[in-house]
A protein has these predicted regions:
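ATP-dependent carboxylate-amine ligase catalytic core
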Residues: 20-32, 57-142, 152-153
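Nucleotide phosphate-binding/pyrophosphate-handling subdomain across enzymes
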Residues: 34, 134-146, 151-248
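Residues that mark the start of a beta-strand
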Residues: 35-37, 59-61, 196, 223, ...
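Hydrophobic alpha-helical packing residues
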Residues: 51-57, 118, 270, 316
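Glycine-rich phosphate-binding loop signature in dinucleotide/nucleotide-binding domains
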Residues: 118-124, 218-222, 290-299
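C-terminal helical cap/extension that packs against the catalytic core
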Residues: 196-197, 239-299
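Glycine/aspartate-rich loop-and-adjacent alpha/beta segment that forms the canonical ThDP
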Residues: 306-321
Length: 321
């Protein structure tokens, strides 16, 4: 019997692009016919969390799969807002890996694992994004489902309209309460003010564009300091999108990330477009440098790999106590 660590390690080794045309035949259709699909957008996980919160506040059991989790893959598979346990992750993962480990990409396996888990937990609703590296429709029957367009706004009205398509009676006060409780970690999350410390999961060209747009919208006249730790496969486009926007850029080597670009190399890339570059030896040093350079109205935005971002968040949250 495989344990959590073994399943996780084997899952991480699955290569994108290894999917076979008959993958779909290997998977039983999930029989939950209350599925809410959210097509690809920067805000798809935030929309999903808001929908989950409203349904949960109305006493429904909700399974949600996310494209993004700060801590580990357990955070991508949520049942009633709680991550799947290591025991269940190992149990469901082993069933999929043992006979079919060459037939799934990593994201396919995680999604199928989530759907099997939600089915056994008797979820009333599934909330699924469709930018997971494979189409959610491969593994779930789209009998009674609806989708959020990426052009629609992320707001209470959007989520409630979407849910009303399921003929669910919503209570206004309950919706308000759910929205007040809803908070999405690591997506333009303000951790501290004066100066402003922001954590964001931007780690590629598209998400970095969104981050820059949000900074310009909310803080158009504030100086920016960026703390950046990136993977090797996405840093070039990220550098082009954000280098000129910052007054100062601090690079780091993300911890526990074998595919990360070393901070010193990332600094060299940034320096081609912006001379105000510093490479820090740790997240703590990066935050200390930013704090020294910042004025009260400075916006310090950290973005990049998930492990680095979670360490940054925990450091800032700890100093707030």
């Amino acid at each position: 019997m495989m344990n959590y660590t073994q399943v996780l390690e084997q899952t991480e080794q699955l290569k994108i692009g290894k999917k076979l045309p008959d993958t779909m035949k290997l998977c039983e259709k999930n029989d939950c016919n209350k599925i809410i699909y959210i097509p690809e957008s920067y805000e798809c996980d935030a929309i999903g969390e808001l929908i989950e919160a409203i349904l949960k506040e109305h006493k429904y059991n909700v399974g949600r799969f996310t494209t993004y989790a700060l801590k580990n893959p357990l955070g991508q598979i949520l049942y009633n807002k709680k991550p799947i346990s290591q025991k269940d992750f190992a149990k469901y993962g082993e069933k999929l890996l043992t006979p079919n480990d060459t037939l799934f990409t990593k994201e396919e396996l995680l999604l199928k694992l989530a759907l099997d888990y939600f089915k056994d937990e008797n979820a009333d609703f599934l909330v699924l994004p469709c930018d997971t590296g494979c189409e959610a429709e491969l593994f779930a029957e789209k009998l009674d489902s609806c989708a959020v367009s990426e052009k629609e706004k992320v707001c209470k009205e959007l989520a409630t309209t979407l849910i009303l398509q399921k003929n669910i009676v919503l209570q206004e006060k309950t919706v308000e309460r759910a929205c007040q409780k809803c908070k999405y970690e690591g997506r333009f999350e303000i951790l501290k003010k004066k100066p402003f410390y922001i954590a964001d999961g931007a780690d590629d060209e598209k998400s970095t564009k969104h981050l820059m747009a949000k900074l310009q919208y909310h803080y158009p006249n504030n100086p920016y300091i960026f703390i950046v730790g990136m993977a090797k496969d996405s840093y070039e486009t990220v550098v082009k999108e954000c280098a000129l926007a910052a007054q100062q850029i601090i690079t780091i080597t993300p911890p526990e990330a074998p595919n990360a670009i070393p901070g010193i190399e990332l600094a060299q890339e940034f320096s081609k477009l912006n001379p105000n570059i510093t490479n820090a030896s740790s997240i703590e040093e990066a935050v200390e440098i930013a704090s020294i350079l910042a004025e009260k109205d400075t916006v310090i935005a950290a973005f990049g790999t998930t492990v680095f971002l979670e360490r940054y968040r925990q450091l800032l949250l700890k100093t707030n106590k």
